[in-house]
């Protein structure tokens, strides 16, 4: 009998989900950094 993980995903599925998460999280961080720079250029906060 195969071991079941807490999430119910296989090792391959978990790797695929993690890779997609890393990609979207990195895109979010880059977008947030660009937004902060643009606001800083528009109206410096200190």
From Swiss-Prot:
Cellular component annotations (GO), alphabetically ordered: plasma membrane; plasma membrane light-harvesting complex
Q: Where in the cell is it found?
A: Cell inner membrane
Q: Which residues cross the membrane?
A: 20-42
A Gene Ontology MF term for this entry?
bacteriochlorophyll binding
Topological region Cytoplasmic: 2-19
Q: How does it sit in the membrane?
A: Single-pass type II membrane protein
Which protein are we looking at? Light-harvesting protein B-800/850 beta 1 chain
């Amino acid at each position: 009998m195969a071991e079941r993980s807490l999430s119910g995903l296989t090792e391959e599925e978990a790797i695929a989900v993690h890779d997609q998460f890393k990609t979207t999280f990195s895109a979010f961080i880059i977008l947030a950094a660009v937004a902060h720079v643009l606001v800083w250029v528009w109206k410096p906060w200190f």
